[in-house]
């Protein structure tokens, strides 16, 4: 957590966490102050990445998803704030930074302005319980159509990582997925076999993943941990024998 605890004096005076958070980062009543606060927060994130040697940062972009907590979605609703946040991050992490630190967006990349697409290494899509290549191609098309004025279909496809929900489906590797050959396999493996197709052309994807990958640990013998993820890796990038 980047925001420090509420000072005792403030807490005694009745300051709420929401009030303190805005006060600490400088989020005031003006648009300029809010943009500055977002930039300050972005730099604090990058400072932590540098300090602890992290690989990068994942923005959960979910403005249209239901959330289990209260949120005012101010990064999304305040004009210019989200672009300022992303652009500040991208100076120190991501493909524009030259640092080999990753900047990825998870959830709804298409909720961001199309001008920000090339600021990210990957677009992570929560393609949970998809059952066919057709559904995955529909997910792909949403992103390609959104970014089409700034990025080619190939550039978008290369950033796409599709994920299954292992919080619910780790034991079976996902839900039943029907391949283009008509066979039924676990959806994570279907995602691994999937070749992104748009407007009749096939492209390379960024990869696949799983939400709560740790739930798969111990699903098989002690000699083979993470069996479904390992199989997915082998499908996409077979070991040299």
Model-derived features with residue positions:
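Chitinase-like catalytic core of GlcNAc-active glycosidases
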Residues: 1-164, 168-186, 190, 202-205, ...
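Solenoid-like repeat scaffolds
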Residues: 194-199
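Aromatic-rich peripheral "rim/lid" segments of glycoside hydrolase catalytic domains that contact
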Residues: 214-241
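Glycine-rich phosphate-binding active-site loops on the catalytic face of alpha/beta enzymes
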Residues: 208-213
